[in-house]
């Protein structure tokens, strides 16, 4: 009940004010973390149903609805915000392999560089890659996996696919520097592209979250798999429920804090067991969210230690606007803080990484 004589600000106005303060770096990290944890708790209350019957119904209903959608939506919006950033910035924030996804920390003393390699090695092991295999890396980012596979398996042909010009140019330049003649980079949108060849192994790391119609996507990828080919997928997930990455209600400021609303799906750990029309699941693993939480923590440490180097880069890409440059720095700080809290929630036992190995039907 409102106190007489005092005007209560509308919730939307409060959230707008909060987001403005976050943009300007006016909220202490501890307070940001606390606010994020509150929203994550609300998401758990929203997603965890009171009966298992309701839980499965929610999951199955989402799989049915996705089958009615396009393969992907709002790809350009996400690309502009997340992936078209200066390579020099990524060289500062990421490890030496420029792996922009979950890394694998074997123990407390593992460095970010070691964790990058450990995860790349785990991909190769779980995908059962052998020297001489033809390998397709879909949504290759800055080429961490492409370059690692090409260097490790000298007799393999590795094809990377990206829809980013800067990523393509960087991977091609790195291939030349490393004298790798077994790398090809294609500039393409995988939702519309028709691949002329088939591959022994197809690797997809943290791309499926940005897709919608997995039935059509997997049907498309199946056509690119050799007869005995395997598809390895890494995706982030919640252990129990899946959801469109959209605000729960008008109080949910967090969902739009890092990613544009509606551009992502957060699958459940078991989500892709429901999409076996064209491929079959061979194996399935999960990794504690603590690995991705620590990855984000290491990224944030590097970012904070090099803010003075990063500022001029962002001033350049924001049209010589220092205020916009600081907003961009604060955005990336928020990205890391969000990842730390989300994947670290409940000791890494809520949101985590899932690995799925498929074979062709």
Curated annotation (Swiss-Prot):
Tissue/organ expression: Highly expressed in rhizomes. Detected in roots, petioles, flower buds and leaves. Expressed between the developing stele and ground tissues near the root apical meristem, in the immature endodermis, the pericycle and the spokes of developing xylem in the apical region of the root and in the protoderm of leaf primordia in rhizomes.
Alphabetized Pfam families for the sequence: CMAS
InterPro entries, A to Z: SAM-dependent_MTases_sf
Family: Belongs to the CFA/CMAS family.
Coiled coil: none
UniProt-recorded Gene Ontology molecular function terms: (S)-coclaurine-N-methyltransferase activity
Pathway the protein takes part in: Alkaloid biosynthesis
Induction cue: Not induced by elicitor treatment.
Subcellular location: Cytoplasm
Job of this protein: Involved in the biosynthesis of protoberberine alkaloids. N-methyltransferase with a substrate preference for (R,S)-norreticuline but also active with dimethoxytetrahydroisoquinoline.
Claim: Disulfide bond is one of the keywords in the record: no
Catalytic residues identified in the record: 336
Taxonomy of the source species: Eukaryota, Viridiplantae, Streptophyta, Embryophyta, Tracheophyta
Record GO cellular component, one term: cytoplasm
Enzyme Commission numbers on file: 2.1.1.140
Keywords, ordered alphabetically: Cytoplasm, Methyltransferase, S-adenosyl-L-methionine, Transferase
Protein name (record): (S)-coclaurine N-methyltransferase
Subunit: Homodimer.
Binding of S-adenosyl-L-methionine, residues: 101, 139, 163, 167, 189-190, 205
UniProt-listed GO biological process terms: methylation
Reaction(s) catalysed (UniProt annotation): norreticuline + S-adenosyl-L-methionine = reticuline + S-adenosyl-L-homocysteine + H(+); (S)-coclaurine + S-adenosyl-L-methionine = (S)-N-methylcoclaurine + S-adenosyl-L-homocysteine + H(+); heliamine + S-adenosyl-L-methionine = N-methylheliamine + S-adenosyl-L-homocysteine + H(+)
